Amino acid sequence: MQEKKSGGYTKKILVVDDQRSQLKLMKKMLERIGYMAVTVDSAEEAEYILRGEESFSMVITDLKMPWLDGLNFCKKAKILDPNLKIFALSGFLYDFDMNELEDAGFDGIYEKPISKAQLAEILNVGIEKTRD
């Protein structure tokens, strides 16, 4: 569990999913364990945010979204910041080529729905990789 700094959270995570129910769930789970979650319902909006001055410890994104999917979002985000840790979530992993997902630069790929234990694993892997 993350300790909160005085007046705020220690880590800020961008969560991208076109399903608002998933965004609410992820935000609630992350905030309960001391992370700040910024949620957006499109990869285009997430890309716009990443181009700004706000920085994030990591990104957790859905793969199957309209217009810009998670795979192409990851490629664009890695161009903006090659060190940004990005984790994919999808209920439709069978629709994707795992090699292509790994080549895009994802730091982890998980099937929805994720458990609290899997979320903890994502956070631990992301934080450890951030420290490297």
Where would I find each of the regions flagged by the language model?
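Alpha4 helix (beta4-alpha4-beta5 surface) of REC/receiver domains from two-component response regulators
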Residues: 72, 93-109, 117-121
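Non-catalytic signal-transmission and effector/linker regions of two-component phosphorelay proteins
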Residues: 1-12, 115-132
